[in-house]
């Protein structure tokens, strides 16, 4: 399935059905009076986050969504049926923006979360509403109210526990394919990964987390260089980062600083995320070279640097274990915060 993280769609809710002109006609009832029913309400347009989706590709080929019009009222004071709603299904992590992309209308971060995009028009009034002492047979009705229409942008920011970052050819796709059942494209040239890939790492019962392989960043990515600008936003949802560095390149410190610089320039909390720094491709290096480049990275970053090889598998399990420790820590913190907030709401009372 192709990946698409932005789509522009047009939505229109249904018009309300019109009120009815009708008069009671029954045997032995000489003056039946008006009995025109009201029109039905027009259908609404909703957007809902559902399970099993991780792309907006469905909205590349279909961009117009219109709900049904409400049925007109009928005689014997029967109200027309309401128009059928339209529900746009999107992945969790989808943001809704107005047409000029300046205002975020909603952020769907949880499965089942729903937002009303366009409310259907109310139904009109039948002639039974307009009977008076001086007008026993009114022919007046009120038509249904029109629906709403608008253009909106859907923007997906993947929700993952860990984001894989690094320069092109750092070995991120190979690592993801080894630790999960994901099947990203792998080749020995830059920008093999053109779109984010998701994989589930399973370390045992109750020890699973999601990893997002973010396409390779280059210097100037935050300004639109390369392909990194569009996908830096996906890292915002990740609780932590694994920063892979190709150990076979000449200057590993420069590679580290380039990616860190892009994260800091982009902002939005990216520089503050917990980061695991790892020197990759040690299968193509001797022990002395590994030790030398590891020491250079530790001196430049002030962090402990892990070593691994996605090809041979050396160090992969240890790296996943470290990532899981951070994921578990973050989940516990989120749970504690949610419980504290819930407790605070329960304990609130008007003064």
Curated annotation (Swiss-Prot):
Main localization (coarse): cytoplasm
Entry's localization field: Cytoplasm
EC number: 3.6.5.-
Alphabetical keyword list: Cytoplasm, GTP-binding, Hydrolase, Magnesium, Metal-binding, Nucleotide-binding
GO terms for cellular component: cytoplasm
Cofactor: Mg(2+)
Obg domain sequence ranges: 1-159
Entry-linked Pfam families: GTP1_OBG (PF01018), MMR_HSR1 (PF01926)
UniProt-listed CDD domains: Obg
Keyword Cell inner membrane: no
Family annotation (InterPro entries): G_OBG, GTP-bd, GTP-bd_Obg/CgtA, GTP1-OBG_CS, GTP1_OBG_dom, GTP1_OBG_dom_sf, OBG_GTPase, P-loop_NTPase
GO terms assigned for molecular function: GTP binding; GTPase activity; magnesium ion binding
Domain OBG-type G, chain residue ranges per copy: 160-328
UniProt binding sites for Mg(2+): 173, 193
NCBIfam families membership: Obg_CgtA (TIGR02729), PRK12297.1 (NF008955), PRK12299.1 (NF008956)
Assigned protein family: Belongs to the TRAFAC class OBG-HflX-like GTPase superfamily. OBG GTPase family.
Subunit structure: Monomer.
Functional note: An essential GTPase which binds GTP, GDP and possibly (p)ppGpp with moderate affinity, with high nucleotide exchange rates and a fairly low GTP hydrolysis rate. Plays a role in control of the cell cycle, stress response, ribosome biogenesis and in those bacteria that undergo differentiation, in morphogenesis control.
Protein name per the record: GTPase Obg
Source organism per UniProt: Maricaulis maris (strain MCS10) (Caulobacter maris)
Gene name linked to the record: obg
């Amino acid at each position: 399935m192709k990946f698409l993280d932005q789509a522009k769609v047009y939505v229109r809710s249904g018009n309300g059905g019109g009120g009815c002109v009708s008069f009671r006609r029954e045997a032995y009832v000489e003056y039946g009076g008006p009995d025109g029913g009201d029109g039905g309400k027009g259908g609404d347009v909703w957007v809902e986050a559902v399970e099993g989706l991780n792309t907006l590709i469905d909205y590349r080929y279909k961009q117009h969504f219109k709900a049904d019009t409400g049925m007109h009222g009928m005689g014997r004071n029967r109200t027309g049926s309401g128009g059928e709603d339209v529900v746009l299904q999107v992945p969790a992590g989808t943001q809704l923006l107005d047409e000029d992309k300046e205002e975020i209308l909603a952020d769907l971060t949880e499965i089942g979360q729903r937002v009303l995009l366009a409310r259907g028009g109310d139904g009109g009034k039948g002639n039974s509403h307009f009977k008076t002492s001086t007008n026993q047979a009114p022919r007046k009705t009120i038509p249904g109210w029109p629906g709403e229409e608008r253009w909106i942008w859907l923007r997906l920011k993947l929700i993952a526990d860990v984001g894989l970052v690094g320069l092109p050819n750092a070995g991120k796709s190979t690592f993801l394919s080894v630790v999960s059942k994901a099947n990203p494209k792998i080749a020995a040239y830059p920008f093999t990964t053109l779109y984010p890939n998701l994989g589930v790492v399973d370390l045992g019962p109750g020890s699973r987390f999601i990893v997002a392989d973010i396409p390779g960043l280059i210097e100037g990515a935050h300004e639109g260089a390369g392909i990194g600008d569009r996908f830096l936003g996906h890292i915002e949802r990740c609780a932590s980062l694994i920063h892979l560095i190709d150990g076979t390149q000449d200057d590993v410190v420069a590679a580290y600083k380039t990616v860190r610089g892009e994260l800091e320039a982009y902002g939005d909390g990216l520089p503050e995320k917990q980061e695991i720094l790892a020197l990759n491709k040690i299968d193509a290096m001797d022990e002395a070279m590994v030790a030398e480049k590891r020491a250079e990275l530790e001196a430049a970053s002030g962090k402990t640097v892990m070593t691994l090889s996605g090809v041979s598998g050396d160090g992969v399990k240890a790296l996943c274990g470290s990532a899981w420790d951070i994921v578990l820590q973050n989940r516990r913190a989120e749970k504690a915060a949610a419980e504290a907030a819930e407790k605070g709401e329960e304990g609130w009372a008007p003064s």
